[in-house]
Amino acid sequence: SGALMSRIIKLWLLLFFFVPAAALSYEFPPERSKSDAETEFGWMVLPLPIVVEGIGSGVPIAAAISNVYKSADLLMAKTFFEGDFEINLFSFSKFPLIGDKLLFSFGFTDLNMPFRSYDRGIDSGKDDYYQTLEKYDSNFVTFQSQFYKQRLEFLVSYSTGGTKLEKIFDVDGNDFSNIQSPQRRWIDRVIGTQIDLTDNHLDPNEGLRIGILHSESNYGLNELSDYAVNDLNVTAYFPFFETHTLLFNAFQSRSYITDNGIVDENALRNKYGLGCDLETETTACQNAETRRINYWLKRNQSSKATALGGLNRMRAYSLGRFYAANSSNYVLEYRLNYSEKRTPINWIFLGGIRTVLQTSFFYETGSVSDDIARLHEKMKSSFGVGFRAIISGLIYRFDLAKGEDGIAPTLFINYPLSLGTLGS
């Protein structure tokens, strides 16, 4: 299997360095285009049921309004019905401060819902996790500058957040509430740039797109390590027939510690223990406690690169499923645009100008490792089909992917394989 993986990696390298050069040499960069429908007013309002086994359920109502003011978009979500979770989300993005040269975004999130933390590394199993029920809040501001018909972009973002743990659940649904150090806060700083040498900023058919993102997380706590992450995202688009597109995507993420926290297990256990002596299920509590201590101990020792799994990459796996100090991901996706007719939509829950209906087929392979020399020794894969509609400049996406953990659906706004909010 090692020899086979070596051949696969060499094939990817050939594809990314030689095929794009040959295919794009005819007209590169391609002529830039933009549809008037991208600036039309549009909306979507839908309930999004959330069910987490062993913890509970909730039904937030999500609303997206595109081009509410010039290029600015509005995104909101809130739980109006009684349930086990609470979600309050507001985001106002791409407000033009100086024409289309300087865009401003801001938003806040206020949640009371569960988060799942898996064991570290590519070998973690689908049941190797603990879950936390948390009160979570965050705020962000972002400035984006775009030049040369959005071919060149710069981004600066600042966000603060905090969380308070109310309960911890093990994989069997046992819950423990005697949590030491339940609160933590952080500050994130992000800078990035993107070079977009494609024919269309919203829905590329040909060309090359390169994005770089640097982020720093500062916890302000002596017990937790601060760290930084560098991400590189490269996507090459090749036109097939009149409206189809074949894309290759390569993603690399590297992280490193900027300020050391506690790396002694006993000292960390004193800070993040669960008081298992006070629990009825003592053994189950101790297992969950050990899993939590190992999570933070290894994160303090080796930091955490951008994880694989969820909405953007390795779509067959849960959000944040695979993580370590380094991660990589490679994707082959074929997109069939079978309708590009400008079609007005005026439904109660969905409206705007539809310009594209699309079906996609994709294959992904990726890995994570604390040792960069072993990053590609063992890979996980994901494959599936997606359905997308572009309505008034927003991309509504439903993907269905299969991997070792089973089949997973994704319902989201925006294409996959993006790099933060670059290009959005």
Please name every model-derived segment.
Residues L202-G352, I413:
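C-terminal outer-membrane beta-barrel translocator/porin domains of Gram-negative envelope proteins
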Residues S1-R32, L422-S424:
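Cleavable N-terminal export/targeting peptides
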Residues V51-E53, I65-N67, T79-F85, P96, ...:
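Transmembrane beta-strands of outer-membrane beta-barrel pores
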Residues E31, P114-D259:
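Transmembrane beta-strand segments of outer-membrane beta-barrel domains in Gram-negative
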Residues W43-V45, D73-A77, L102-F106, L152-V156, ...:
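Transmembrane beta-strands of outer-membrane beta-barrel proteins
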Residues A23-F106, L155, I179-N205, A305-R315, ...:
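Outer-membrane beta-barrel initiation region
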Residues T79-Y148, D175, L247-A307, L400, ...:
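Outer-membrane beta-barrel translocator/channel fold
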Residues I191, F387-I391, I407-S424:
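Outer-membrane beta-barrel "beta-signal"
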